[in-house]
């Protein structure tokens, strides 16, 4: 069967500007349409069930960011000053290469490559690759930061949604996009992005660490599209190619053709789960940066579809009937958390993933109250306790669900007090064009939960003892798709109505 646990997310960020740099040929290696440079994600989409996609149109100019994913916007505008005299000042700088053209330190992300003059303000330059040991040591810090960022996002999403409505989002998807934006972010934008993402200042090696989070169950691919008149810096192109396995592709002057090109990429990289992301493309669109994460996970132990039946679920002040998956001896790690007054349960999935469910302890407790009490420290304590808990045969009742969410991310960014994302974004490391602005940012998620699993249930009959543990999900709940290896949420959300 097709779907077991299916999640799809899309994030769309469109950047538009008045015009490109006055000299579009300055420091731009992306003017050649690399149609032959196919993104590596195309063959991976069909292997997973959870899919996430991010669309961005930022103009980032990479200048001196090492492999760190921390970039914030600074008020430093690097105008087209490198276009007037691209290579006439190499001898005035006592660099180690007296007469070598400094305009092509591309394809290898050199460590000590001289950056273009930036009039005193910080602007990211060539990226320094970290060793495997450094990247590995960064992963624990990144996982912890992703937990903090996920809880920030959860509360921001919850505040923007109507009361008692379903929602689902991928913090990993959004973080992946914003981290790639960091490659080209200047001063204040860099600082603010680091703060929003809960990254330490100058978080080196974050891009490689993030790449390491893509495991067999989670596939991440990226692609950049840009208008012909937009000069993208070589440093950003090379960093994106090395760290995100994508090379920019040039859009045409035909909006319909561009729309088809982008939607086709989306469909391929979400296994056709999202066949049409965009219905139209703004005429002033300059850059589209896409990141698709497709995650496949099946139940470690299969639910028997024959045991799925219509059962009561408490929704608002009424009781509705929904398809409930049932098992008398399903392996569940669970306990009662007194801080949240909630039942916490963890179900194993394939590829070292798990589904964590937090449901109010009884009908007297509301999901809203549980959400308000859910802080990063409380969440981390719960996950640590789950890690020490054993999976035991449990009488499990869990609704079959499908949740689709679409959210304007600009309002979320404002909720997170990151106002410069809309008004004063500094992407000097991506392009010299100072006029680029974010015109749209969308995040879409689809969650589908059905019975199919990886391993067949054991055929041996086991008598059910009277003391059998019970975990019933018959009222609104919060869910987390958890990466057990790297310890971070891939997806989060809540379910009020399993039918929606």
Swiss-Prot record:
UniProt-recorded Gene Ontology molecular function terms: serine-type endopeptidase inhibitor activity
Main location: secreted
Domain of life from the UniProt record: Eukaryota
Signal peptide as annotated in the record: 1-22
Chain intervals with Low complexity compositional bias: 20-31, 67-118
Complex formation: Interacts with MASP1.
Protein name, entry field: Plasma protease C1 inhibitor
Native species: Homo sapiens
Gene assigned in the entry: SERPING1
């Amino acid at each position: 069967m097709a779907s077991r646990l299916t999640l799809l997310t899309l994030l769309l960020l469109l950047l538009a500007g008045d015009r490109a740099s006055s000299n579009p040929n300055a420091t731009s290696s992306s003017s050649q349409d690399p149609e032959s440079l196919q993104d590596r994600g195309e063959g991976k989409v069909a292997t997973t069930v959870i899919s996430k996609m991010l669309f961005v149109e930022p103009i980032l100019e990479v200048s001196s960011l090492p492999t760190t994913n921390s970039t914030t916007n600074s008020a430093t505008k690097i105008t087209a000053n490198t276009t007037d005299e691209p290579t006439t000042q190499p001898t005035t700088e006592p660099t180690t290469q007296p007469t070598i053209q400094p305009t092509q330190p591309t394809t290898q992300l050199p460590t000590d490559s001289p950056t273009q003059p930036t009039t005193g303000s910080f602007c990211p330059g060539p990226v320094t690759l970290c060793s495997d040991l450094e990247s590995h040591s960064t992963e624990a810090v990144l996982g912890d930061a992703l937990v903090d960022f996920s809880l920030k996002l959860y509360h921001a999403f919850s505040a923007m949604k109507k009361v008692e409505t379903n929602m689902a989002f991928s913090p990993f998807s959004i973080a992946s996009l914003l981290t790639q934006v960091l490659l080209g972010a200047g001063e204040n934008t860099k600082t603010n992005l680091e703060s929003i993402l809960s990254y330490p200042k100058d978080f080196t090696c974050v891009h490689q660490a993030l790449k390491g989070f893509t495991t067999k169950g989670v596939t991440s691919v990226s692609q950049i599209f840009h208008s012909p008149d937009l000069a993208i810096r070589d440093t950003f192109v090379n960093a994106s190619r090395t760290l995100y396995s994508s090379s920019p592709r040039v859009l045409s002057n035909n909006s319909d053709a561009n729309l088809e090109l982008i939607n086709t990429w989306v469909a391929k990289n979400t296994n056709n789960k999202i066949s049409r992301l965009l219905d139209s493309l703004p005429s002033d669109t300059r850059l589209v940066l896409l990141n698709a994460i497709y995650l496949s996970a099946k139940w470690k132990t299969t639910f028997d579809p024959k045991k799925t039946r219509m059962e009561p679920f408490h929704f608002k002040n009424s009781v509705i009937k929904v398809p409930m998956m049932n098992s008398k001896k399903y392996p569940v790690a669970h306990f009662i958390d007194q801080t949240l007054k909630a039942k916490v349960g963890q179900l194993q999935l394939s590829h070292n993933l798990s589904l964590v469910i937090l449901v109010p302890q009884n009908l007297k407790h509301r999901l809203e109250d549980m959400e308000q009490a859910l802080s990063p420290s409380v969440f981390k304590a719960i996950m640590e306790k789950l890690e020490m808990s054993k999976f035991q045969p449990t009488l499990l009742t869990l609704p079959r669900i499908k949740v689709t969410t679409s959210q304007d991310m600009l309002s979320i960014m404002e909720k997170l007090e990151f106002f410069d994302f809309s008004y004063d974004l500094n992407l000097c490391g991506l392009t010299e064009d100072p006029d680029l602005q974010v015109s749209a940012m969308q995040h879409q998620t689809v969650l589908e939960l059905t019975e199919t699993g990886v391993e067949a249930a054991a055929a041996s009959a086991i008598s059910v003892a009277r003391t059998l543990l019970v975990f019933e999900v018959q009222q609104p709940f919060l869910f987390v798709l958890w990466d057990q290896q790297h310890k971070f949420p891939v997806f989060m959300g809540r379910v009020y109505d399993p039918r929606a």
